[in-house]
Amino acid sequence: MARKPIAADTKPAPERRSAAQFLPDVQTIASLKEAARGCEGCDLYLGATQTVFGAGKRTARVMLVGEQPGNEEDLKGKPFVGPAGKLLDRALEDAGLDRDETYVTNVVKHFKWEKRGKNRIHKKPNAEEIRACLPWLHAELQVLRPQVLVCLGATAAQALLGRDFRVTTQRGKVLRSELAEYVVATVHPSSILRQQTSEDRERELHALIADLRVVAGLLSGDS
C-alpha cells in the first residue's frame, strides 16, 4: 500500500515586524517624524526615552547618516547633539560646510544601550534591528532627495551600500547610487573620540575633514 503523503505545514510564517507598518500614507518630513514617535517596529523603543528622528534643512543638498542616537540624543530628542555631534560640527566647519544647511539622521531611530553602573552605554544595533528601522531612512531619502549622501561609519555604509562595503578602504571616494547623485562614506565621529591618544584623535579628525572636503567639492562642482 502506498504511503499517504505527509501534509505540508500550511501555517503562514509570522509577519516580520518593521517600521514599514508605521509609515504614514502622505509622507513629508513632518509627517514621518510624527509617525515615528509611535514606532514599535522592533523592541528598541522599550528601553529608549523617545524616537530620535532626523533633523535639518528640508531643502538640504547634503544628508549625513550615522548609526543611532546616543545617550544625550535620546534625552534631548535630537540627532548629533552629544560629544560626537560637536566633533562633527567642528569637522563640517573646517571642511567648509554649514551644518544648518544639512540634514542629519541615523539608520536606527532609538537608542540601544546597556547599563554599566549608573551610565547607559551605547550598544551596537544588530542586523534585525537595522532591517526593521530602515524604512524610516528610505522614506527620508525619498522625501529629501539629497544631492550628496554621507555615510558616517560602517553601520550606515553597510546598511545602505551593502554588507561588503568597507569604510577603511573606500572612505572619501565618490560613489554613484540610486540613493543620491553622489555617495561618500567616512568614519563616524564617535570613532575618533575613542582613539587612545590626542595625536591619534587629531590625525583621525583631519582625515574626517578631508573626506568632508570631498563633499564640499561636489557641491561647488570642483570634483
Regions found by a protein language model. Give the residues of each.
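A polyanion-binding, active-site-adjacent surface
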Residues: 2-223
